[in-house]
Amino acid sequence: MGMVSLGKTKLQVSEIIQGTWVMGKDYWGGAEDRESAEAIQCALEHGINTFDTAYIYGKGHAEELLGEALRGVRDKCVIITKLWKTDMARERVQPGLEEAMRRLQTDYIDVFFIHYPSETVPIEETMTALMRLKDEGKIGAIGVSNFSLEQMKEALRFGEIDVIQPCYSLLWRFIDRDILPFAIENKIAVIPYSPLGQGILTGSMQPGHTFR
């Protein structure tokens, strides 16, 4: 498995990243915990060292499952998780991080994303709190997900963005217009979600496929 540097950080992430949305059980049909644990073990055996999760994936269930599966190998892995909208106020950022660390059985998070921009909390509050936690060593890298270019520029007024996570695939290429060039110019890493078009690009769907 190839490894790449994550933007300007010292983190080395695998070229393929294991996602865990389905492991939360509330989207995409769900998955049995045993199957999820086996999938994580299979990823490790094939050289994947980076795992992406979030509180909203089963209200913490995917984080808890991942934390248990990575016991004993935590120091060899890169864990990505995300701050949900309810935890973006200044006084909620650190508790939100600490709750995620507890579920993941770790005392630091390698990459901590703002999952979605808030409609009510000024980004200055969230970014200032995240920068403090990064300075304290509790976060290795700060990311933003589902941000527009203007929202990224506003966030950068108050801190660092090490990585972005937009939806991006051969079918969904809107970031080519402005976000991707900006990220490249500023050495901001890009970890896309849904790179296989939520299954459409896997080759499993043939002409005449019936969607239900």
What spans do the regions from the language model cover?
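Conserved, mostly hydrophobic/aromatic
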Residues: 6, 18, 36, 51, ...
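Short, acidic/polar
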Residues: 30-43, 89-104, 148-154
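N-terminal binding-site loop/beta-alpha segment at the start of enzyme catalytic domains
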Residues: 1-77
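A short, structured active-site edge motif that brings together acidic residues
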Residues: 76-88, 111-115
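Short, well-ordered coil/turn segments that N-cap beta-strands
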Residues: 11-16, 47-49, 74-77, 106-110, ...
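CE4/NodB-like, metal-dependent polysaccharide N-deacetylase domain
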Residues: 93-113, 132-136, 157
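Acidic (Asp/Glu)-rich catalytic clusters
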Residues: 8, 67-75, 98-105, 156-158
